[in-house]
């Protein structure tokens, strides 16, 4: 079994990725994606190494909710916990993320 020492950061805003990189770069290997499609490609390739995914909701190409749907359909939520990072603090958004399999929401 491989060591899970990688964080996958998924956010279309570069500044958010830079901030998160700064928080975790000394302790973890980091992978970055700008949208959900890129995230799923990286996840399929490196899922055995990924300790956690930090996932934005609102992104172009494929949003975070669709990523959670795809992960659930492919059994990847059992392997990689997902923390949703979003400015949307609505109850509806939180419930949707949890219903789709998010481990937590920030």
PLM region spans:
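Receiver (REC) domain active-site loop signature in two-component systems and cognate sites
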Residues: 59
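Acidic, metal-coordinating helix/loop segments flanking the phosphotransfer/catalytic sites
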Residues: 32-52
């Amino acid at each position: 079994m491989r060591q899970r020492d990688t964080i996958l950061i998924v956010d279309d805003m570069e500044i958010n990725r830079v901030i998160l990189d700064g928080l975790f770069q000394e302790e973890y290997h980091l992978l970055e994606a700008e949208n959900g499609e890129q995230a799923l490609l990286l996840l399929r390739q490196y899922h055995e190494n990924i300790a956690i995914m930090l996932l934005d909701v609102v992104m172009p190409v494929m949003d975070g909710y669709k990523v959670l749907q795809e992960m659930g359909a492919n059994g990847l939520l059992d392997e990689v916990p997902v923390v949703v990072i979003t400015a949307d603090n609505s109850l509806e958004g939180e419930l949707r993320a949890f219903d789709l399999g998010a481990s937590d929401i920030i």
